[in-house]
């Protein structure tokens, strides 16, 4: 049987956990086997910028940071389960990728 690998990525870990819970509920309702969610390493993007717009004065810096959290879920590729997966309401800041594997 084919497996669907669901990759979730977003900046808010609470949103990711909510979607992971919905995927597990769908798997329980349809009776398919699910493994995960597996938390993947968090990527940290840092951008340093000068506070002074003209370059004069002391060299003071601001550091901006964005953390990208990722989760991985493997689910059996049942037609009903995949149809319900496509209907999940996903927030705009969460990226979902579904890949079918043998």
Swiss-Prot record:
Quaternary structure and interacting proteins, as annotated: Part of the 30S ribosomal subunit.
Identification of the protein by name: Small ribosomal subunit protein uS10
Protein keywords: Ribonucleoprotein, Ribosomal protein
InterPro entries, A to Z: Ribosomal_uS10, Ribosomal_uS10_CS, Ribosomal_uS10_dom, Ribosomal_uS10_dom_sf, Ribosomal_uS10_euk/arc
UniProt xrefs under Gene3D superfamilies: Ribosomal protein S10 domain
Alphabetized PROSITE patterns for the sequence: RIBOSOMAL_S10 (PS00361)
Residue numbers spanned by region Disordered: 34-58
Signal sequence annotation: none
UniProt-listed PANTHER family: 30S RIBOSOMAL PROTEIN S10 FAMILY MEMBER
Family: Belongs to the universal ribosomal protein uS10 family.
GO biological process: translation
Upper taxonomic lineage: Archaea, Methanobacteriati, Methanobacteriota, Stenosarchaea group, Halobacteria
SMART domains, per the entry: Ribosomal_S10
Gene responsible for this protein: rps10
Described purpose of this protein according to its UniProt entry: Involved in the binding of tRNA to the ribosomes.
GO molecular-function term, one example from the UniProt record: structural constituent of ribosome
GO CC terms in record: cytosolic small ribosomal subunit
